[in-house]
């Protein structure tokens, strides 16, 4: 019998007997475990061989045998739990232990660095599953980061300085304003073993032609081996950076036929997905990666929803209490903001916008927040911390305003906290705030009726590229803000847009109302090197490494 099954049977027997040694019979014990008399005898003999109990059998009618426990079910359960932790079977651990507080304590004690069979393993605790990793779909901040570890694109953007770098394409040139040429490196392999072909690249880029920022791609051809020509309908100075974004990452052309591709994707990046469940994401260094092989062999993201209620509970990778910690922090390049929906009469009403933005000002939200949030929130007066575009203007409550609808996406505890504060403030002015929580996909599409939307945005480097690119790619914003997005996109591509002025106009009209900048924090280990927090609150796994202990 497998060891795990035998351990479960012993724990069950110990629990049924309340851990007490006793006189009993095979029939009684078999009834407790719902098995045959013969199987019960086999179980007892095997457990006795393991040293967990003794079984002194008595022969004869009416005679009772002696069962003595030498090991407690709790001790064996702890041993089994330790085994499951080492095997990264978090789903089975949750079933075994049951108590969430105990599971959390066990997980935290095993965070950080692990060295097993010559491999460096990093364990990270996160508050929600990361089930959708498909480039080009609606991806949240953390999914965007993970996708960058799994996939490659023609170009890549350095997370630390925002500079453009080579990736699958080793060089590129602009032939004319409407014609770009990229030179691809040969010998690139997908995680499932197949070599990347030009058809994979062409299919991946044609797949995203329906997205607003890629809709100006007229044709993609390969005039000679490992050469890719991209023809545009309008000039685009940002095209090389655009092709380094997550939507433009390269997929195997047969991706739609591969099982569960969104949760178990196959790319050409430094890490390959090994497991992705509601309890755990495991990625492993790809030995055939065309760039520098990752220094950390395996990254395990353990999911524990309970840490979502902690203000700084986004990403935890600190180990045991006795180990030295290293804290990395930065103020996010972005903010939480209110988005007024011009499709509803209250959302489009300028008086409503002025009054709501006045009573729900950043300082009011921070003032009414609990102290634990006040330490991490910074009032926002622009979409970026460096901007001060918002002006606080006293405004009177519009006559007849009795209720408003606020919508945000679920699995985000701070959305609930901020919405609760808003509800409290508006109630003091006799306005009822109806709150809707919807899925991220529903939020992204923006087809649901709501007066106001509570959103958050994290912009990546370089900011003059990503800010407009991010806002333009969210259908919800295009639905809510009635401007000519296509004309603005053309100006942005040509380098004719003053981005600060464009954002200031959105804030001045109260289409978007900045609320809070958030401090992003990673609590790491002193032994980890190369940990540089990016603007998404994560770090590049392949560049991090563990320093060996000092020689004795």
Curated annotation (Swiss-Prot):
Tagged with keyword Lipoprotein: no
DNA-binding region (UniProt annotation): 26-49
Keyword set, alphabetical order: Activator, DNA-binding, Repressor, Transcription, Transcription regulation
Superkingdom of origin organism: Bacteria
Start and end residues of each stretch annotated as Solute-binding: 163-492
Keyword Transcription regulation applies: yes
GO biological process: negative regulation of DNA-templated transcription; peptide transport; positive regulation of DNA-templated transcription
Protein name per the record: HTH-type transcriptional regulator SgrR
Provenance organism: Escherichia coli O157:H7
Name of the gene encoding the protein in the UniProt record: sgrR
């Amino acid at each position: 019998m497998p060891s795990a099954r035998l351990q479960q049977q012993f724990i069950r027997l110990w629990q049924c007997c309340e851990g007490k040694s006793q006189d009993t019979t095979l029939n009684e014990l078999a009834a407790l475990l719902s098995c045959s008399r013969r199987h019960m005898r086999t179980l007892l003999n095997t457990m006795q061989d393991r040293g967990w109990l003794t079984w002194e059998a008595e022969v004869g009618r009416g005679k009772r045998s002696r069962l003595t426990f030498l090991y407690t079910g709790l001790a064996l359960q702890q041993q089994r739990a330790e085994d499951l932790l080492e095997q990264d079977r978090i789903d089975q651990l949750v079933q075994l232990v049951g108590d969430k507080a105990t599971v959390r304590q066990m997980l935290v004690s095993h965070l950080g660095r692990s060295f097993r069979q010559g491999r460096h393993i990093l364990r990270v605790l996160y508050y929600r599953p990361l089930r959708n990793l498909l480039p080009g779909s609606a991806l949240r901040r953390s999914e965007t980061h993970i996708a960058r570890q799994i996939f490659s694109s023609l170009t890549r953007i350095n997370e630390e300085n925002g500079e453009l770098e080579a990736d699958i394409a080793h060089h590129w040139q602009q032939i004319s304003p409407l014609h770009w040429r990229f030179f691809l490196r040969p010998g690139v392999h997908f995680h499932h073993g197949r070599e990347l072909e030009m058809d994979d690249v062409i299919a991946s880029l044609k797949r995203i032609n329906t997205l607003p920022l890629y809709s100006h791609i007229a044709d993609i051809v390969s005039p000679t081996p490992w050469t890719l020509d991209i023809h545009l309908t309008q000039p685009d100075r940002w095209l090389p950076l655009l092709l380094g974004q997550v939507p433009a990452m390269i997929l195997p052309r047969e991706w739609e036929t591969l099982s569960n591709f969104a949760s178990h994707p196959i790319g050409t990046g430094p890490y390959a997905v090994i497991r992705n469940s509601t309890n755990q994401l495991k990625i492993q260094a790809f030995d055939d990666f065309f760039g520098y092989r990752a220094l950390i062999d395996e990254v395990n993201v353990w999911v524990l929803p309970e840490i979502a209620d902690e203000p700084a509970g986004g990403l935890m990778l600190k180990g045991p209490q006795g180990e030295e910690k290293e804290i990395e922090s930065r103020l996010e390049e972005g903010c939480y903001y209110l988005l007024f929906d011009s499709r509803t009469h209250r959302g489009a009403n300028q008086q409503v916008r002025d009054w709501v933005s006045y009573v729900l000002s950043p300082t009011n939200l921070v003032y009414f927040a609990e102290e634990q949030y006040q330490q991490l929130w910074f009032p926002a007066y622009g979409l970026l911390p460096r901007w001060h575009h918002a002006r606080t203007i006293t405004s009177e409550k519009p006559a007849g305003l009795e209720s408003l609808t606020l919508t945000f996406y679920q699995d985000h505890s701070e959305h609930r906290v901020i919405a609760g504060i808003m509800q409290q403030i508006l109630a003091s002015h006799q306005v009822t705030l109806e709150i809707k929580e919807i899925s991220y996909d529903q939020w992204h599409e923006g087809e649901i009726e709501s007066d106001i939307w509570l959103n958050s945005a994290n912009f990546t480097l370089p900011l003059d590229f990503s800010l407009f690119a991010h806002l333009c790619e969210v259908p919800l914003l295009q639905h809510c803000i009635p401007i000519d997005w296509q004309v603005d996109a053309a100006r942005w591509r040509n380098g004719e847009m003053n981005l600060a002025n464009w954002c200031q106009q959105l804030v001045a009209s109260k289409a978007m109302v900045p609320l809070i900048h958030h401090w992003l924090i990673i609590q790491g280990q002193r032994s980890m090197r190369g940990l540089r927090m990016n603007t998404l609150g994560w770090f590049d796994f392949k560049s991090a490494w563990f320093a060996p202990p000092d020689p004795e």
